[in-house]
Amino acid sequence: MLEQFKNPDRIYKGTDFWMLNDELTDDEIRWQIREFKDKGMGGFIARTYVGLRTDYPGPKWKHQIRVMLEEATKVGLRVTLQPLRMPGGFKESTVEETLDIIECVSKEIFESEDYRQAEYSTILAEYDDHYIVVHKAGCLPDEETGIRYGGCLNMFDPEICRKYVQICYEDNWEEFREYFGNTIHTMWVDEPLVPMHAIPYP
């Protein structure tokens, strides 16, 4: 008992919340994982984060996840994979697959000539004298420009939701299935979550 207290199993040790950003390299990945082990960690969450320059969820990203899993297996750390959060979207999501704003608008305003968003909007529902409308992300008049930062998936579309599950879950299973149940402890995601800059309602 005393010996186990001095050197506990990895399930009793901490899990590092590893924010993966910038350009990942194989050597840096291996070094950081060895540092986790050296500092007494029992595992880590490999979390995609703001500033990531590697091609998530592309071939280079998958290669580097495999490097992580190989090194973690070698040193005895447990890994938690994190797909991109839902409904925040995924790197390949298109303007057509995302929502920008969901809004309740009076019919009088929506049907007036001054309501500029009408031509970029779809009416989702009608209640008495109001519409529930969605404005598509990235739709601006020709003379205006703006920055599109993320957005959220159109969860009203089953096909888009299935695409998210395919890219973020099923593809990971197919690619790394030999590690699930041993090195890969679980998959974690803070879903559902819409980032504050992309809340789809006023």
What do these predicted regions represent?
Residues 6-8, 33-40:
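Acidic (Asp/Glu)-rich catalytic clusters
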Residues 10-12, 40-42, 73-79, 181-185:
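Short, well-ordered coil/turn segments that N-cap beta-strands
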Residues 18, 36, 72, 187:
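Conserved, mostly hydrophobic/aromatic
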Residues 23-36, 165, 169-176:
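Short, acidic/polar
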Residues 47-166, 177:
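Acidic/aromatic-lined carbohydrate-recognition and catalytic surfaces
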Residues 185-202:
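Carboxylate/His-rich catalytic cores and anion/metal-binding grooves
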